[in-house]
From Swiss-Prot:
This is Probable fructoselysine utilization operon transcriptional repressor. PANTHER family: MANNOSYL-D-GLYCERATE TRANSPORT/METABOLISM SYSTEM REPRESSOR MNGR-RELATED (PTHR44846), MANNOSYL-D-GLYCERATE TRANSPORT_METABOLISM SYSTEM REPRESSOR MNGR-RELATED (PTHR44846:SF1). May regulate the transcription of the frlABCDR operon, involved in the utilization of fructoselysine and psicoselysine. SMART domains: HTH_GNTR, UTRA. Pathway: Carbohydrate metabolism; fructoselysine degradation [regulation]. It comes from Escherichia coli (strain K12). GO terms for molecular function: DNA binding; DNA-binding transcription factor activity. The keyword Translocase does not apply. Keywords: DNA-binding, Repressor, Transcription, Transcription regulation.
């Protein structure tokens, strides 16, 4: 390939890349939406497959697009920053991001407190309310939240709670309990089939698993929870201050 040909190819590639970026910025292709196939883009832009492939590969490397094996190439959802030291409910978190929140309950039941009695400081023969929800930010699934709430401390919480209500608001209004601190641990977890379905990700895709114990104004445990979120959808920020 001559120097002139290489220069011409680079111009075509840069033009196609920019046009794809412009289409994404203008909402032609929205977050989570599949872009046309390489063949379709070749026809649309009247360029070779090599040019299209390079433009797409660069946008994948930049985190603008994501390839799903066997499915195609999709517009990557914008990452959400989550400060690890923030103690707030999901509704407050959505407000801080300037985005609409929604939840879908996928499981709720009374279960034995035995696996959680030490963390919650409750008798092993008591019960907890298990609440599992998919949490959405601007209609995109952000994470799965599984919580276990001690019914010995918050009687009939499972009957008071209705889908869409804020659990932290219920704690405060019905039980005079304010969540003021929590302890979190983080590890990486491979997405199971049900998690992949709800989070719209690949089976085995890396997820952040954030395990949490929340405490009230009297330093008593309020609930334990596990959050599973796609590692490529969220940025975790640790803000340390020296006193």
């Amino acid at each position: 390939m001559s120097a002139t040909d290489r220069y011409s190819h680079q111009l075509l590639y840069a033009t196609v890349r920019q046009r794809l970026l412009d289409d994404i910025a203008q909402g032609v292709y929205q977050a989570g939406q599949q872009i046309p196939t390489e063949n379709e883009l070749c026809t649309q832009y009247n360029v070779s497959r090599i040019t299209i492939r390079k433009a797409i590969s660069d946008l994948v490397a930049d985190g603008v697009l994501i390839r799903w094996q066997g499915k195609g190439t999709f517009v990557q959802s914008q990452k959400v920053e989550n400060a690890l030291l923030t103690v707030s409910g999901f509704t407050d978190f959505g407000v801080s991001q300037g985005k609409a929140t929604k939840e879908k309950v996928i499981e709720q039941e009374r279960v034995s407190a035995a696996p959680f009695c030490e963390k919650l400081n409750i008798p092993g023969n008591s019960e907890v309310f298990h609440l599992c929800r998919v949490m959405y930010l601007d209609k995109e699934p952000l994470f799965i939240d599984s919580s276990w709430i001690p019914l010995s401390r918050y009687p009939d919480f499972d009957e008071i709670y209705v889908e869409g209500s804020s659990t932290y608001q219920l704690f405060q209004e019905r039980f005079d309990t304010r969540v003021v601190s929590d302890k979190k641990t983080i590890d990486i977890f491979a997405a199971t089939r049900p998690q992949a379905k709800w989070l719209k990700c690949e089976l085995g895709e890396p997820l952040f698993r954030i395990s949490k114990i929340a405490f009230d104004q009297n330093d008593k445990p309020v609930h334990v929870s596990e959050l599973f979120c796609r590692a490529n959808r969220i940025t975790l920020t640790i803000d340390n201050k020296r006193h």
